[in-house]
């Protein structure tokens, strides 16, 4: 719809088709799953207060206020080797249970995580290099949180790397400031995330999303009004 509505003003630069669960196949607000079968997006802002603190820009130039920064990454997922793992190995890599999405120290998807829990042998229940543990914000940097909106993709095998599948994710996240939120998270993941064994980042971009229209106060009577006026358009 947006492409058709803007055909006289803009052209498509790049397109990646993606999909998530069909509408009505899950309860409203349920966390979607990625192509590894994992719930993806459990730790997302939920309340208006969370969105105000993590997503909507409230500092900087006036034209950016109320908007958000969007990071897009194409991530190829090696499903061929992932499917050779047993269930416990998959859950250890992510730090969560496959069926419920609960942390390995809990029973429900949204249970609090206990990173200090150990098993009968004194080993951590949640591996310190699991995806969940590495992505979690440090105690001294609670601002390192983002809104995830990933989409799955499945294309015909291209034969370039010998995989039987060409499957992955269009990872999209929103935040106030990528340099203070997304980038430090991704730096930790690059360094030690166990999931790196099965993930290859093949594309990356960053965008600014203007705020929606706010006809009531006249500031944004049409989309991107403040941005266009600032740019002299």
Enumerate the predicted regions with their spans.
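Long, histidine/aromatic-enriched segments associated with O2/redox biology
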Residues: 1-233
């Amino acid at each position: 719809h947006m492409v058709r509505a803007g055909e006289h003003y803009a052209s498509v630069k790049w397109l990646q088709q993606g999909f998530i669960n069909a509408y009505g196949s899950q309860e409203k607000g349920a966390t979607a799953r990625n192509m590894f079968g994992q719930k993806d997006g459990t730790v997302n802002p939920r309340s208006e207060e969370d969105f105000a603190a993590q997503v909507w820009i409230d500092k900087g130039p006036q034209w950016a206020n109320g908007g958000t920064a969007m990071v897009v990454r194409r991530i190829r997922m090696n499903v061929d080797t992932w499917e050779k793992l047993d269930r416990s190995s998959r859950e250890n890599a992510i730090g969560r249970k496959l069926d419920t999405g609960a942390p390995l120290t809990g029973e429900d998807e949204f249970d609090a995580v206990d990173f200090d829990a150990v098993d009968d042998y004194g080993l951590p229940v949640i591996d310190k290099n699991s995806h969940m543990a590495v992505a979690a914000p440090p105690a001294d940097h609670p601002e390192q949180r983002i809104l995830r909106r990933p989409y799955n993709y499945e294309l015909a095998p291209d034969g370039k790397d010998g995989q039987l599948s060409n499957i992955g994710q269009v990872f999209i996240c929103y935040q106030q400031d990528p340099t203070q939120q997304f980038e430090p998270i991704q730096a930790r993941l690059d360094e030690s995330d166990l999931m790196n064994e099965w993930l290859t980042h093949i594309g990356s971009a960053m965008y600014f999303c203007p705020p929606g229209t706010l006809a009531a106060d006249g500031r944004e009577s049409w989309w991107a009004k403040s941005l266009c006026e600032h740019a002299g358009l």
